[in-house]
């Protein structure tokens, strides 16, 4: 009979099989009431799960991320239940958990309105108050297919029909509502008390634009009301900071239907782009990288050799010329190996650090595109380091140190790190993996960096480190990557002559700090709400005259500032000064310089910083020195 080992190491023995719920009750009434699910030998299960053999067990409550996931998954089913009661003709499809919430896709004859969402949310609350028991059932696949067909749920029947016939399927029942799901779920709808439907959007069935357009209802669910209110406040703030809105307001960029997923950079937006790219260019050159440039379009044969044709062909834009097939490159790495392969390489040439601001194209589904955050044409701060096995740790440590400095310069100081290790299916020897994983861990440890270990989550060709930054709204953005690769140098014949005079394959380190420059600029815009630090701002300041009598002096001030290297505009319109100040404040310029008769007579300038801060009068040389220090320090505030 089962001996249950709890997280604190204590063991509870039973003389008969027990459910997770019964184990929770044996520990205490409070835990039994708080329990949402269980974790048996590392696997999440329902409270009704029957334990018949010795096993470790943790009771899952609302206090951890796993408990929140169970709540959100169950709330997605509650949403579908409510929709089916209110709109019986709607067909259900899928409803997964996503970051901070969930969604559910429906097929319905007309778009859901905001009023519909209010009704659905109200019905969800009613179903929750009824405390309907939620139970798991296991059916033969064919029985489940026939059942959902009989209910008119053709999408759900299609999903189940794709499961191998010999496999049983897991269904969850709450009242009259039944849905396909692996689970686990809360034991009763009464556990679902804090939720909110947030929006409705379109989504293609199975993510394919050739299929029907469905309606995706998004929602969020939490354990506590305060958490929900904080999250909704964050959403409100995120809406104000939406880079798409600010991109229009600040005249940075636009995207139009004729070029989906491609960015039209306006002059101010391109100035911002140049500041980011030029900063990164100086940074990599100062750290021993050589910058290269490779072709945009490459013969299909190279992508077949590299393995990308098999893995990425659906995401690749292709073309033909003179009976040859070409692909627009979705990544730079195979092309960088072509440069490495030109001429014999020696161990003395390693490490070789090769960087490119490479323009890549990927045929992302149209439904996945999102402003400049998710596009089809993007530029990466991409680099590849070719090195010997014994150089991996040193190169990894140098990269990690560089990455931290770059993020700090852009105003991000909180970095989350994940180290992903060998999967079951992999290339390379165990000795190679042991050494590579140890080198990456040692590089992180040497700098005292905390990281989450992700066993089995590495790529088949090598372990990797992922770096995510937190913005001012505590949103997490995965940007940086350090990926070891034992595979591609072998596939593409990259070799060097080692000290033993034999040819060896180098280890290839794929690395990026910003990732997509488009996406990173979108993150910057939202992080700073468009009020970019002086060194990044497309326009540093505008010079404003109070009346026509100061036009000549204002023009001279603007000229001297431009001559000193600053990006300055002059607004000499015959408008009231308060009107001009308000207008330019909307555009979030770091500084406004006001020129009146007093300033002209004294040969000084009156300076206003962003946010209406009056810095008073000062000589122009003093202002120039102030700005130079601010730019050099790359200081900025949220």
UniProtKB/Swiss-Prot annotation:
Disulfide bonds: none annotated. It catalyses: tRNA(Thr) + L-threonine + ATP = L-threonyl-tRNA(Thr) + AMP + diphosphate + H(+). Residues 242-533 are annotated as: Catalytic. It is found in: Cytoplasm. It holds the Pfam family HGTP_anticodon. Its cofactor is Zn(2+). Zn(2+) binds at residues 333, 384, 510. Binds 1 zinc ion per subunit. GO terms for biological process: threonyl-tRNA aminoacylation. InterPro entries: aa-tRNA-synt_IIb, aa-tRNA-synth_II, aa-tRNA-synth_II/BPL/LPL, Anticodon-bd, Anticodon-bd_dom_sf, Beta-grasp_dom_sf, TGS, TGS-like. It is an enzyme of class 6 (ligase). Residues 1-61 form the TGS domain. GO terms for molecular function: ATP binding; metal ion binding; threonine-tRNA ligase activity; tRNA binding. Homodimer. Catalyzes the attachment of threonine to tRNA(Thr) in a two-step reaction: L-threonine is first activated by ATP to form Thr-AMP and then transferred to the acceptor end of tRNA(Thr). Also edits incorrectly charged L-seryl-tRNA(Thr). Belongs to the class-II aminoacyl-tRNA synthetase family. HAMAP family: Thr_tRNA_synth. This is Threonine--tRNA ligase. The gene is thrS.
